[in-house]
Structures are given as C-alpha cells and as structure tokens.
C-alpha cells in the first residue's frame, strides 16, 4: 500500500507541475483541438478525415487514407523551399535553422492547444510537423509568386494554387479549413509569416481573414466580417475557428447573460417538422442575405411579429455542407465556453425541421433549402443524421439562441383554433372554386337562417 500511495503522490506532483507550466508566462490557448469522439465519428467518419492533406499532430504520421491524393512528405518540403526562398528575398541570411528555433519556442504553447498530450512525439518531430504543415498552408492559401510572398493577390481558391487545377485547390481548402482535427494554431502561421516578410504577421492575418470571408460569401453561409461576441477571442485559434467567427446571429432571442432561472420555465424539448408547422398555419419564407444590418449569416432565423411566418436564410447545400457543419459542431462541443453553441443550435433546428422527405420538399418549394442531391429523401437523411451523438440542452438560453422562437411556434401549434383555421385555409380556400362554393354555401346558410327567423316572427305576430 505504501508503494501505491507513493506512486499516486508522484503522479499528482507531475500533474501539478504540468498545470504550473501552462501558466508560467506562456500564452493561454483560446481554442482547444480535440479528437472527435467515436459516438460522433461513427455516424460518418469520412466527414472528419482529410482527403488531400494531413495537418497537425492528430494526423501525424501520415494516416491511412482511402485517397491516393494525400499530400506526401516531398509536397510539404517543396512548400518549405518556396517559403524559404521568399524569406531570403527579404532577408538573405535567413535559414531553416531560424524557423526551427522560433517554432521550438512555441512548442509548449502549441501543445497546450490540443486535448491530447502527444507524449509519443519528440520535440524534433513536433516542431518539424509545425514547420512543414504551416509552410504548406501558407504556400497554398496565400500563394508564392516570383520567389516572394504574394499577399496582395489572395483571390479565390482556384487562384491560390497556381500549379494545380481547381479540384485540387478546393480539396486543399476543404481539408485545411473545414476539419476540426486537421488544424494547427493560427499563431504558428503568423510566426512563419513574420519570419518570411518584414510585416508578415499582420499581413497573414489580414489576407487569410479576407480569404475566409470570400470563401463564406461564395458558399452563401455569411455576408459580413466576424462580429466579436465576448468572451470569444479576436484572433482566431485556427482556420476552422476563423470560419466559425463569421457565423454569429445578429440578434439573440435571449441574452446569454440572463440567468436560466429568470427565463420562462417552459420546456421546448424539440422542434416540430416543417409539415407540422405548416399544418398549424406557419408559413416558411426564404430570408434574403441582402438585408444589410439585419442578417449576417445563415443563422439569422427570424419569426415575424404575428408569429405566422418563419423567415429562414437559404441554405445552399453542396457536397461539403455536411462536412463543414459537423466539424463546426465539433469545434463548439470542445469550446462551448469560448465560442458558444450558435451553430449547434442552428443545426439542431434545421435538422429537426427538415427531417423527412416531405419537409425537405416543402422547404425547397419555399426557397429555404437549395440542393443538388439526387432526391429529397437523401437530403432528409443527411439532416436527420447531422446532430447524432452531440450534447446540447435546448432549454438553456445560453446554448440555444432560438429558444424563444421555438416556444412561440410551439404555442401556435398547440392552439386548436389556429390549427382549425389553418386546416380550413389549406383544405378549401387555396382552391378558388372550393372557396367560391364554400362562400356560396355560407351565404345560403345565413339567408336560410334569416328567412327562418322572419317566418317565426311573422307566426307569433299573427
């Protein structure tokens, strides 16, 4: 027993030593990158695995991939050569040794940005990975032209890879931006940029941020630059977090600062399907992204004052939509206190509202959903699987910014008079001939009642 106690004391001492090192003057890590849990990954593991390039310690060494196009060691070495050539144009004495030493100083900060400790990776392996992966990302996203860092011509994904085709460019963007595990801290990219040009740190931040905004606009996910919501950091933790920063609703239904106990204790449980809401008289309307100041991204769902129309920004679904949404959810699952749960709340909403083929068909007709899949059933299945395995409390206003909207819609659905009127409108009044017939029958009934009343009155007067 004494041996056991001694062993536990040693481990506690080691643990306390590790905690002390985190706060010994090194920068705190704002965004933690963790391994996707099996419960979530098992729904569709391909949505979390890289197809073109493996980045970061979770994918080191090169993972076993079904894709034959995964970037090899020589591809990343070629990127290092391009970055070094650009650096020597500004600083002729620049060497690889300088990069290695500078990144070695960031090793502890970088390791603190991951949920795993990676004790099996030596310092040399870890720094080597950071340097090669960082150079690969910068050379692809920023671009290297004529042996200098061309940060003034970021452009589109197609233009950022001068020697490859559009498909390769899109594959790079997908892997380095969209995947939760496939990340290295943003400050590593800034450090490499700082060593490469005189003002490289600021320029890397500015131009990669512009690149991300252009990407979100072209995919129709967001239209405006990020709006900072405390306590979220101003500087992105990694590239996926940079995309996440663009997805903030303009106005929250309930302020996150409001204690749960002060909110109306009505449980929302879950959203009803689009067809159920439609049966209760709720209309769905596509909300235009052109409403400047009123809508910033696809999360800006709005219920009109009367509660009869739910305005939802159009979700343009392509082959990468599910991958991006799933990985954004994973980012929030790991960093809820820092980044919130807005994307998760939106995904829970849209996945429950559009969970059947008829729901997708209805929302497609209203312009809320646009997709290029083979059929609506396939899209409905993807929506139904979107939030499997996640942890989310719909009754917590700090998690669910759409809680008040859900409550109002539920009250409308539970109102029998509204449902009867809605049923009458949908069953009869949408067909003009049926409406005319119903009106004529109603007029005839009223006239018959009037005639009966007059007949009774005349009888008593006699």
Regions found by a protein language model. Give the residues of each.
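Non-transmembrane
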Residues: 1-436, 458-462
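C-terminal helix/juxtamembrane-tail motif
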Residues: 427-428, 442, 446-462
């Amino acid at each position: 027993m004494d041996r056991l106690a001694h062993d536990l004391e040693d481990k506690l001492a080691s643990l306390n030593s590790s905690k002390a090192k985190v706060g010994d003057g090194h920068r705190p890590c704002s965004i933690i990158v963790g391994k996707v849990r099996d419960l979530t990954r098992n729904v569709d593991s391909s949505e979390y695995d890289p197809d073109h390039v493996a980045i970061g310690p979770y994918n080191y060494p090169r993972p076993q991939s079904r894709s034959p196009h995964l970037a090899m060691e020589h591809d990343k070495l070629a990127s290092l050569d391009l970055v070094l050539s650009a650096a020597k144009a500004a600083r002729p004495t620049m060497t690889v040794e300088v990069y290695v030493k500078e990144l070695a100083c960031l090793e502890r900060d970088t390791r603190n940005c991951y949920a795993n400790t990676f004790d099996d990776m030596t310092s040399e392996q870890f720094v080597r990975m950071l340097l090669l992966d960082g150079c690969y990302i910068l050379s692809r996203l920023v671009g290297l032209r004529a042996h200098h860092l061309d940060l003034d011509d970021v452009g589109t994904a197609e233009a950022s890879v001068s020697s490859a085709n559009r498909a390769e460019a899109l594959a790079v963007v997908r892997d380095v931006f969209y995947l939760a595990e496939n990340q290295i801290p943003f400050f590593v990219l800034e450090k490499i940029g700082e060593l490469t040009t005189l003002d490289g740190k600021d320029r890397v931040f500015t131009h990669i941020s512009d690149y991300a905004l252009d990407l979100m606009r072209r995919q129709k996910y967001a239209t405006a630059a990020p709006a900072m919501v405390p306590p979220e950091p101003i500087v992105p933790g990694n590239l996926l977090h940079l995309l996440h920063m663009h997805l903030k609703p303009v106005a929250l239904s309930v302020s996150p600062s409001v204690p749960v106990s002060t909110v109306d204790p009505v449980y929302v449980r879950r959203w009803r399907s689009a067809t159920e809401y439609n049966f209760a008289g709720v209309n769905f309307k596509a909300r235009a992204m052109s409403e400047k100041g009123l809508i910033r991204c696809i999360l800006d769902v709005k219920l009109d004052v009367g509660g009869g129309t739910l305005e939802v920004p159009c979700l343009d679904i392509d082959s990468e939509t599910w991958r991006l949404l799933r990985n954004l959810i994973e980012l929030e699952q790991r960093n809820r206190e820092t980044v919130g749960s807005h994307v998760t709340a939106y995904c829970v909403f849209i996945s429950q509202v559009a969970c059947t083929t008829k729901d997708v068909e209805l929302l497609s007709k209203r312009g809320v959903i646009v997709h290029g899949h083979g059929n609506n059933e396939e899209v409905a299945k993807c929506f139904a699987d979107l939030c499997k395995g996640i942890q989310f409390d719909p009754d917590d206003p700090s998690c669910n910014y759409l809680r008040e909207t859900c409550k109002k819609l539920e009250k409308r659905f539970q109102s029998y008079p509204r449902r009867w009127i809605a049923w009458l409108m949908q069953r009869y009044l949408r067909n003009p001939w049926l409406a005319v017939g119903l009106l004529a029958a109603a007029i005839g009934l009223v006239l018959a009642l009037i005639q009966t009343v007059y007949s009774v009155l005349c009888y008593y007067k006699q």
